[in-house]
């Protein structure tokens, strides 16, 4: 039997969101050249029964169970270790792709770009609103010839707003930080240091969906500490490569002041 050629590997970390995961997978076209790698981060057995999912019969879905846990960063690294596609895309299990995805994939299947950045919607289910992603600002500014590509590479840092040539990731051993939050930022920034042939598309390909209970909106001190340490790493790397835009630490601390023990404030400013 001839082995199918995989052009696109979709990597989706998952934990305890079976219905939303099903919705995400259904937004990805079923094609011979696509594989969807779902890495389950030790979901609760009373919440998830993977044997009952409609997509369990799809030939393009690969389920990897990580019983040791480790968070989304660990799950994405496992996905990278198992991906076979020429291109990689990342999705969160509670998000979806737009109807533009299929044509977008066809447009770049044989291109020689290292990376293609694309636009996203933000759908706010918390306040029943819908607005453009702030990350589109970097893309729109660049496409209007008022910005530079460095701001796109280092500003549009979410993993899900880009089509990535897998060989760039493998050859440079670019990995996700295996922490509970902010695990994706340094991956994208390190990736930006290595990509040379870059395309920026005005197509809206991804729906980022805000909902109650998502880690991005969990008011946790641990999330703050992870974010703070990531910003230190981020600024250190920016300094190393000569990129002038940095995260202003006092502003970050002010914005997150409710998470900080006032007696410990000095150690963040030293």
Predicted features and spans:
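C-terminal subregions of glycosyltransferases and related glycan-biosynthesis enzymes
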Residues: 2, 30, 57, 180, ...
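Cell-envelope/extracellular polymer assembly enzymes that use nucleotide-activated donors
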Residues: 6-9, 27, 35, 186
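Short, well-formed alpha-helical segments that are part of the catalytic scaffolds
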Residues: 13-30
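Conserved short acidic donor-positioning loop in nucleotide-sugar-dependent glycosyltransferases
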Residues: 16, 28, 41-45, 70, ...
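Acidic donor-binding segment of Leloir-type glycosyltransferases
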Residues: 25-65
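Glycine-rich, basic loop-to-helix element that forms the pyrophosphate-binding segment
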Residues: 66-83
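Donor-binding/catalytic cores of nucleotide-activated saccharide
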Residues: 72-76, 93-198, 209-224, 228
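Short aromatic/hydrophobic "clamp" motif used to bind/position activated sugar donors
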Residues: 88
